[in-house]
Structure formats: structure tokens, C-alpha cells
């Protein structure tokens, strides 16, 4: 069975299917671009088994790598870390960031206003690009762009 090329696959309009993870005590906001196909199936962030996010954040927080969604939520909120994405809806082929078009950005103001966000980090260049284009000026905050934990980022290993 041959893998289809992006040109052979069809665009799908995706609207972000689940809410941000944060609470009133969140101080750090980590932004992805848009949930992958696997994340949309699981209805939670960084659901692809080869995505390195949970291993990396666990190492940074000096915690065991969580396996369930509830463990992931508890770990992040205990460390005042919020998760959300820069894209609310777009047209995309599968999980390919390079195919993204017709972007509607996420309104990040509610998360920032209802929490104590002091630092914003973008998980990868795509997230950083859309944050800078649509959200940086509105929020009056800058973000640091980190290497993507996506399995598509073969140049980076953890």
C-alpha cells in the first residue's frame, strides 16, 4: 500500500475540538499550532505516541511521565502550566503543519485574563509564526519559540 502524497489527499476543515487546559493559578502557557489527528481522536493535547511533549515536560518538571489524560492534567496544573493552541480553525491535510491554510486564530485573551500567565512558549515554529502574526500584539506579550516535539521534527531528538 502506497502512502498518498499531500497533493493526493484532501483538505479538511478543522475546528479545535477541545478547550484549553488552565486554571486561575496558571503562570506558563505552552502553545501548539493545532491538535494532530491522534490528539483530535483522544480529545487532548499531544496524543501522538511519538510526540515527545510528555517526555520533555516531565523531565523539565522532574516528574514521572504521565500516561492518562487525568495524570497529564494534574501534573501540568500542579506546576501552573497551561496548554492551548494558536489556531482555532483552519483547512489542513491530516496533521501536516505545512498544509495549513485559511487560519482563524484562537482568542487567547480569556486564558491570559483568567490566569496569572507570565510566560508564553510556542511548541515549534508554526505555533510561533501564528502567535506572532495574530496574538502577540493583542496580548501585549511575546513568546519564546521552542523546538517542536512533533515526530515530524526529525532534526531534534530528546
Give names to the regions the model predicted:
Residues 2-119, 125-130, 143-154:
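A polyanion-binding, active-site-adjacent surface
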Residues 130-136:
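Short Gly/Thr/Asp-enriched flexible loops that form oxyanion-binding sites at enzyme active sites
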Residues 136-142:
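A short alpha->loop->secondary-structure connector
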Residues 156-158:
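Post-His helix in hydrolase/transferase enzymes
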